[in-house]
Amino acid sequence: PRGARVLTADIHDEAAVKAALGDERFDVAVDFIAFTEEDVQRDVRLFAGRAAQYIFISSASAYQKPVAALPITESTPLANPYWQYSRDKIACENFLMERYREEGFPVTIVRPSHTYCGGKAVVALHGARGCWQTLARIRAGKPVIIPGDGTSLWTATHADDFAVGFVGLMGNPHALGTAVHITTDEGMTWNQIYAVLASAMGAPLCAAYVASKFLAVCGRAAGYDFEGPLLGDKAANVRFDNTKIKRLVPDFAPRVSMAQG
């Protein structure tokens, strides 16, 4: 973009990042690719005293599975016995909040759920060729796997809606020292989601229902990790209370429905 200066370095090479940053100071620093506690420890070393706000991209999959009560709020316990990815995100959050409490490190934690855009369709699972393999099967009238009986609730947020909430948190002093999820208000079952996909392609939906636990076992044998993404995420009933993000960012009002997106 006009007016932007691009600084390039490998974030995993801390010395190279320090050299690239020089004496720069930032209103906001965001890390979308921090996945372990070691990653955020490095970020604290890099951005403490350099950024007025540090935004960590966590995950709504960190919320308790199975969820004890709906809707999910930011105070819902964080515990996911099925997915190491989620447990690592929880460890990152715990470390960052400790740094906030003890040192005033200006962290904001964002927990996205399933976020999509025009280049990425919403499906429950797919093979090595990605979501397009599933869409090709729908278009060809072939069976596609839907976990369980397809009646579990899911939330998929269009990137345009997510961006409104995310940008509204940047430089927002009320967002410091807190965690917030950014999700749409629309909840749909997987049956409804796949029906939308089939309708968009003008094809009939031929659903093959398979138990999520069975998929996890079979996937493991074939070299796929379905246990975390399914049992620890997409196979669980989820519905989010967006009161907090709407309070922090009054302009946040999701507008893109699944059918539109």
Ranges and model annotations:
Residues 59-84, 98-103, 120, 126:
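Active-site "gating" loop of Rossmann-like NAD(P)-dependent oxidoreductase/epimerase domains
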Residues 168-230, 242, 247, 256:
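Mid/C-terminal beta-alpha module of Rossmann-like enzyme folds, strongest
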